[in-house]
Amino acid sequence: MSKDLISTDEYIKIKKKRKRIKKIVVLFIFLISILVTLCLKIPYFNIESIEIKGNVNIPKEVIKDSSTIKTGNNIFYTNKKDAIENISLNPYIEEVKITKKLPNKLQIYVKEREALFYNKVDNDFFIISKNGCVLEKRKEIKNMKLINLQGFEFNESKIGSALKAKDERAVKILNDFGVLLKNNTSDVIFTQLDLRNLLDIKIYYNGICVKIGTSDQIEKKLNTAINILKRDELKKAKKGYVDVSYEGNPVFYIEK
């Protein structure tokens, strides 16, 4: 009988303990709810500043406006996913990151695509990034220092999307060239890239045609060509060719 009394006492203690825990949990949830409500309501968490970083050509106000985030909005109500999608609609934007800095600051970091190529179709110039994204169509390209690009279906390509090509390899090859040309620090400035025949790729330096051949070892071929084009006898040449398309010593010819 004493055993039954002990077990009953223990049961009562356990039950009381559970009730206490339940009350504590309810109180904790209640306090959290109050805290969340305060965070969403009090002006302390209203956005006071929106900082834009990483932009080069796109004005800060354009990025800020396209995000649809306003100063005065509660920082916890801010929908980062929607803001990133809105900013990314600009073809010149390659990457967006948004960071909330409590209590009231927002930082938007963007990485821009850089214009490197162009092609003229009728009266419009297609502006192309180094990795083959169509950035825009415009009526003039004065002072933009772009490289003429051949070998793609420009009329079938959409702004904000990759160039259309009959051969899908062309976009990959263009991207490889884009990286190398963007990193070219020499005074050899190429004027045209011809990818119409991927077995006979050509790139031009003023009137001199550089025969690349296939896309194998593009970096090596391009560096070899640049070193040749830097020679004094080729700097003033108006017409000729440099052939680096095969293994062995390259050949060059200057038309007199």
Swiss-Prot record:
The keyword Transcription regulation does not apply. Residues 45-256 are extracellular. Pfam families: FtsQ_DivIB_C, POTRA_1. The chain crosses the membrane at residues 24-44. It is a single-pass type II membrane protein. InterPro entries: Cell_div_FtsQ/DivIB_C (IPR005548), DivIB (IPR026580), FtsQ_DivIB (IPR050487), POTRA (IPR034746), POTRA_FtsQ_type (IPR013685). Coiled coil: none annotated. Its main location: membrane. GO terms for cellular component: cell division site; plasma membrane. It is found in: Cell membrane. Residues 1-23 are cytoplasmic. One of its GO terms (biological process) is FtsZ-dependent cytokinesis. The keyword Transmembrane applies. Residues 45-113 form the POTRA domain. Keywords: Cell cycle, Cell division, Cell membrane, Membrane, Transmembrane, Transmembrane helix. Belongs to the FtsQ/DivIB family. DivIB subfamily. Cell division protein that may be involved in stabilizing or promoting the assembly of the division complex. This is Cell division protein DivIB. It comes from Clostridium botulinum (strain Hall / ATCC 3502 / NCTC 13319 / Type A).
